[in-house]
């Protein structure tokens, strides 16, 4: 079984000079899910990992360089996630490759990424538009004392069962760390829910308690979804984290209660 420590993370590597789908490094989702009591066969959520690729280049049949940006969507039901550095190296391996057409490139990306993830991956050229302020109400201005920065403390989460609301709460203060290199991962996280009113100060303390936590982006979002669901008992819940770019890629994991459909229109934040 592949582990993060087996990947190219934290190692010096040569940039590829020719196309090589073998550079893609899959990591099973099951290990991290088992740590928080999740079973791949009975997931309590639906969702996807949406990647934005900013550094995509190849050669046309006559050898002229081409460039594009792309949106890649990996279903959360895939048995494996795609490790980010390997994704970057794979895209770079296309730089000197002649490809017949843009559609041929898209089909190649779909084939290779789907094989890595173990499930059908969607690829479309283009990116969502930028939005200056996220949709929802920021909780970052709350006047609170905070002294816990890890590990994540679900005990901070609470909800008032006497008030049932539907709202979207947003924080730009989510930070976690790569479990291999220790590099910081920065994100704005949004929680849209219907149910008992979540205590905002407790939620902010909870999100800040990820600050020294080491876990991949996708795993952090699944942990947040699971712990908010367990502690606050919403009727339904959506959690999305929009991470800042690294190596020409950013990732946006989205998890939601079964029956919730992904928003038809999404956006990128200024930090992305």
Swiss-Prot record:
Pathway linked to the protein: tRNA modification; tRNA-queuosine biosynthesis
EC number: 1.7.1.13
Enzyme active site: 178 (thioimide intermediate), 185 (proton donor)
Tree of life domain: Bacteria
Gene Ontology CC, one term: cytoplasm
Record localization: Cytoplasm
Pfam families documented for this protein: QueF, QueF_N
Keywords from the named record: Cytoplasm, NADP, Oxidoreductase, Queuosine biosynthesis
HAMAP family linked: QueF_type2
Quaternary structure and interacting proteins, as annotated: Homodimer.
Protein name: NADPH-dependent 7-cyano-7-deazaguanine reductase
Species for this entry: Stenotrophomonas maltophilia (strain R551-3)
């Amino acid at each position: 079984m592949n582990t993060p420590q087996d990947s190219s993370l934290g190692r010096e590597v040569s940039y590829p000079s020719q196309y090589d789908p073998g550079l893609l490094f899959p990591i099973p989702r099951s290990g991290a899910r088992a740590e928080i009591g999740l079973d791949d066969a009975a997931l309590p959520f639906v969702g996807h990992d949406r990647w934005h690729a900013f550094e995509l280049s190849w050669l046309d049949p006559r050898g002229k360089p081409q460039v594009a940006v792309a949106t890649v969507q990996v279903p959360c039901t895939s048995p494996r996630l795609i490790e980010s550095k390997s994704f970057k190296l794979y895209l770079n391996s296309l730089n000197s490759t002649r490809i017949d057409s843009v559609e041929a490139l898209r089909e190649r990306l779909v084939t290779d990424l789907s094989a890595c993830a173990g499930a059908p991956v969607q690829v479309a050229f283009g990116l969502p538009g930028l939005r200056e302020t996220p949709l929802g109400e920021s909780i970052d201005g709350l006047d609170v004392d905070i002294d816990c920065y890890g590990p994540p403390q679900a005990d901070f989460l609470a909800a008032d069962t006497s008030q049932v609301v539907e709202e979207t709460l947003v924080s730009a203060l989510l930070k976690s760390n790569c479990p291999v290199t220790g590099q910081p991962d920065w994100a704005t996280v949004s929680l849209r829910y219907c149910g008992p009113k979540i205590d905002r100060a407790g939620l902010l303390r909870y999100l800040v308690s990820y600050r020294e936590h080491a876990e991949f982006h996708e795993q952090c979002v699944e942990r947040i979804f699971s712990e908010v669901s367990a502690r606050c008992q919403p009727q339904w819940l959506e959690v999305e984290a929009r991470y800042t770019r690294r190596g020409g890629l950013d990732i946006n994991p989205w998890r939601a209660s079964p029956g919730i459909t992904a928003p038809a229109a999404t956006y990128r934040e200024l930090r992305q």
